[in-house]
Regions:
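Nucleotide-activated donor-binding/catalytic signature segment of Leloir-type glycosyltransferases, i.e.
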Residues: 278-299
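A short, active-site helix/loop in glycosyltransferases that binds the activated sugar's phosphate group
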Residues: 163-206, 216
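N-terminal subdomain of nucleotide-sugar transferases
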Residues: 1-55, 121, 257-260
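Short hydrophobic beta-strand element within catalytic cores of glycosyltransferases
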Residues: 310, 334-337
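Conserved acidic donor-binding segment of nucleotide-sugar-dependent glycosyltransferases
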Residues: 349, 353-362, 369-375
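A charged, aromatic-enriched C-terminal amphipathic alpha-helix characteristic of glycosyltransferases
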Residues: 373-424
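Glycosyltransferase donor-sugar binding loop
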Residues: 240, 265-279
Length: 449
């Protein structure tokens, strides 16, 4: 059998990299291409005024070509979850590329019609969920007041206080449930996400927990970490969540404020695309040495984590996975965290010290003081799934879908060829400002609200 051809679908893809799910999609695709010899293509979205609406353009960074669909502004509510024009464009792409497998990640803005496009093209479809988009119009089960929804199971009748138009939200929920049921395989990043989705009525022909990978530490990380600790032995806390109630910032501020000691540092990661999350947040009155640091990339994260001894993760909602938690554990960084859904499904230390979601600042303060005073300040690294292992797991999961197809066609007919006017896209800013402003406000709100 020839190496399979995989078409990956995600709202973002390199060079428009944004969010943890995009990193997962890109890294798994890269490892499938480099480690397993798969041919991998991607389809994603862009929003540019200099291109016609729904124009298809191709750009490539690394081993994976990315076919970009230009989404125009002013799309309807329904087009955000089911867009016939996007579906038709992807159908043409499927007939032209003739992949052996369609792997769909985050489909907000692209729409669930990609599942139907795969089915009609005779291509097996795997859908990998990363958040609660299939259950929640607001994507993260965050209420308008910035608090976690808490429904378990999720029932559309319980969404009346959150959505603007309950009838259209009900239509959306029914449409997405029917669409997802047509997938050959649905994967979830945690047992928590799978169980909540099942209980809430989402089903598929098959489902599985497919745990996300992370970028593992480099071979010199332990030396870099030891050198930093020798240079500055103060315990350093790190917080990557932004100044939002949902991520626990008010609890952190309240927990540290009454401390009378100064023998620690706190690094706050700034993930803003423009400006700063922290520019209007007063920090000078807090005890200890507080610094705001720029967000790290996959390539330079070891430099950041070498400075951190304890990750603060007081999330006030039930998340599906928690990439940051795994990045920390893989590097011997302790984690102070709440019992926040899929983020706790790991083998890290201190699992008996999880803080209940909704507990006050005093509970977090006790854990901070325990971290400062404990004799065993530094933990050993914990085995964590990397992207190579995650790609290997996908190979195993998808084998029953791909193997019956045999050799995929190498000669494409003129009838199915892509349009001749689909020239390579001109250079694109990797910041992807227009696209993020148009498509990803919900994730930014989760960190700032």
């Amino acid at each position: 059998m020839s190496a399979p051809h995989l078409l990956v679908g995600n709202i973002f893809f390199a060079p428009y990299t944004y969010g943890g799910a995009t990193i997962v999609a890109e890294e798994v695709a890269r490892h499938l291409a480099l480690d397993h010899g798969w041919q991998v293509s991607a389809v994603s979205a862009v929003s540019r005024a200099d291109l016609p609406a729904y124009a298809l353009r191709k750009v490539q960074t690394g081993p994976v070509p990315n076919y970009l669909i230009n989404l125009p502004p002013g799309r309807s509510y329904a087009a955000h979850y089911s867009n016939p024009q996007v579906t038709e464009t992807v159908s043409r792409l499927l007939h032209s590329l003739a992949p052996d497998l369609l792997h769909l990640h985050c489909l907000q803005e692209l729409g669930s019609g990609l599942i139907r496009a795969g089915r009609e093209a005779g291509v097996p479809v795997v859908v990998s969920t990363h958040d609660f988009w299939w259950l929640c119009e607001r994507q993260f089960m965050i209420r308008p007041d910035g608090r976690y929804c808490g429904q378990s199971p999720v029932r559309i009748e319980g969404c009346r206080g959150c959505v603007v138009d309950h009838d259209r939200a009900r239509t959306r929920a029914r449409h997405l449930a029917r669409a997802l049921a047509e997938a050959d395989l649905v994967t979830y990043p945690s047992a928590f996400a799978r169980d909540l989705s099942r209980a809430s009525g989402l089903g598929a022909r098959a489902d599985a927990v497919w745990q996300n990978g992370v970028t593992l530490p480099g071979p010199d990380f332990a030396d870099r970490q030891a050198a930093r600790r020798a240079r500055d032995p103060r315990l350093t806390f790190g917080f990557c969540g932004g100044p939002s109630q949902l991520k626990g910032w008010p609890l952190i501020r309240e927990a540290f404020a009454p401390l009378t000691r100064q023998d620690f540092r706190v690094w706050l990661v700034d993930g803003a695309l423009e400006g700063s999350w922290w520019q209007d947040v007063p920090l000078k009155s807090l005890p200890g040495d507080w610094q705001v640091r720029p967000r790290y990339s996959q390539g330079d994260m070891d430099a950041f984590w070498a400075e951190i001894d304890v990750l603060l993760f007081p999330s006030q909602w039930k998340e599906t996975f928690g990439l940051t938690v795994r990045e920390a554990l893989a590097r011997g960084v302790r984690v102070i965290q709440t019992d926040s859904g899929g983020t706790v499904e790991h083998a890290g230390p201190d699992r008996d010290r999880l803080i209940p979601v909704g507990a006050g600042a005093e509970a977090l303060r006790r854990e901070i003081l325990h971290a400062l005073d404990r004799a065993d300040r530094h933990a050993e690294p914990v085995p964590v799934t990397g992207f190579a292992a995650q790609a290997e797991a996908l190979v195993r999961l998808s084998a029953p879908l791909i193997e019956p197809r045999g050799v995929w066609p190498e000669d494409l007919s003129q009838e199915n060829a892509l349009p001749r006017d689909m020239a390579p896209l001109a250079p694109i800013s990797p910041r992807a400002r227009e696209l993020v402003e148009e498509i990803a406000p919900a994730r930014q709100r989760a960190h700032r609200a």
